[in-house]
Amino acid sequence: MTTALEEQNTQQASVAGRVVRVIGPVVDVEFPRGELPALYNALTVEVTLEAVAKTITLEVAQHLGDNLVRAVSMAPTDGLVRGAVVTDSGKPISVPVGDVVKGHVFNALGDCLDEPGLGRDGEQWGIHRDPPPFDQLEGKTEILETGIKVIDLLTPYVKGGKIGLFGGAGVGKTVLIQEMITRIAREFSGTSVFAGVGERTREGTDLFLEMEEMGVLQDTALVFGQMDEPPGVRMRVALSGLTMAEYFRDVQHQDVLLFIDNIFRFTQAGSEVSTLLGRMPSAVGYQPTLADEMGVLQERITSIKGKSITSLQAVYVPADDYTDPAPATTFAHLDATTELDRAIASKGIYPAVNPLTSTSRILEPGIVGERHYAVAQRVINILQKNKELQDIIAILGMDELSEEDKITVQRARRLERFLGQNFFVAEKFTGIPGSYVPLAHTIDAFERICNGDFDHYPEQAFNGLGGLDDVEAAYKKMTEK
């Protein structure tokens, strides 16, 4: 919350209460009259289980009246009993901020997992903060060049914007996020913060080891609240990561990238907490506060004058249903959407971005330029026409198409393959080096393909390569054989 509120809360620190009820991760605590902790305050309680002492952190979620508060535990409550003494910290959950967090792994409470105790002696910020004032927001729109052809041409990302990666399980959301972290560190020497929300512990370990191996870990802070942890942790880990990113933006005046994998798990954790707190469920069983919780997180991810937080959020789509309230609520906050399609992945084209359903609000002539916009529209029109012709091809075959339509289909197939690209993070699996294609080269390449300059090249020459130089090299190799 605000600094004034934190100062007020600090004055109330060390107030002691006692546990009166424990139901799973929900704990009711009674405090002396007139000394109730504020909402979102962190409470601590000492627990001994099998001769091992530990401290459990709780977060105040509700005031029940009669000097009672209902809190959500940030750890398993095994061993917690009625009558246990609970201490009010007088402030929200706080995490370390600054250069000390780079290259390390933290949990949602700000505890360093790879170097215990790191950062606790330095500056810390509460995870509940207000968004920047409206008059401080940046009004300028700028493209974030990624070097990934399909993204830069058809769904350009906004510097300081919010981008959603939509897709079902196993279509490449996490791989694309890892690739973006690598590219930002290599090309821009930028600071990144990765928030792992409710995902697999194995994925977090793999990410840490891969980033260490590729030499980008020193510019990245990682915050994890994985799927084996209580819902309170999974609901707060995104805010913890965002708070670290805000410090780099507001104090160190850096452009920061915030990666959230997976924003659906944030919603899912909120639903679990809502049910545990006894709230009436809303549509499809989600919490009635879904839109509010999403807004509180997303409104803090923004650009202020001279510095920005650009957020890339993986969005799991339950059963590939885009009308589900969780992805639908996320849509409203995004500047660009990148939809990963299982049908494209099944063709072996990666990244499996669907160019016809992915969108960007800045794909306009006034922002990206007339030529970029014109080439992007030509590519989309060819791919759309090819899609419309698929039913005719399936029933009657290619021979029944007009000559013009045959050319359209052949160019569309080349475009589809050329939209694929080798990734740096996939080098060790494919044995093929990753590629960074500048935006100017991308526009030129797709314009030439649309013009028919490569109609005599076989489709195989366009498979998942970088720029036109790679295509020409592949064609030369094929003709030599």
From Swiss-Prot:
It is a peripheral membrane protein. Its EC number is 7.1.2.2. SMART domains: AAA. InterPro entries: AAA+_ATPase, ATP-synt_VA_C, ATP_synth_F1_bsu, ATPase_a/bsu_AS, ATPase_alpha/beta_chains, ATPase_F1/V1/A1_a/bsu_N, ATPase_F1/V1/A1_a/bsu_N_sf, ATPase_F1/V1/A1_a/bsu_nucl-bd. PROSITE patterns: ATPASE_ALPHA_BETA (PS00152). It is an enzyme of class 7 (translocase). Its main location: membrane. SUPFAM superfamilies: C-terminal domain of alpha and beta subunits of F1 ATP synthase, N-terminal domain of alpha and beta subunits of F1 ATP synthase, P-loop containing nucleoside triphosphate hydrolases. Keywords: ATP synthesis, ATP-binding, Cell membrane, CF(1), Hydrogen ion transport, Ion transport, Membrane, Nucleotide-binding, Translocase, Transport. It is found in: Cell membrane. HAMAP family: ATP_synth_beta_bact (MF_01347). Produces ATP from ADP in the presence of a proton gradient across the membrane. The catalytic sites are hosted primarily by the beta subunits. Belongs to the ATPase alpha/beta chains family. This is ATP synthase subunit beta. It comes from Corynebacterium diphtheriae (strain ATCC 700971 / NCTC 13129 / Biotype gravis). The gene is atpD.
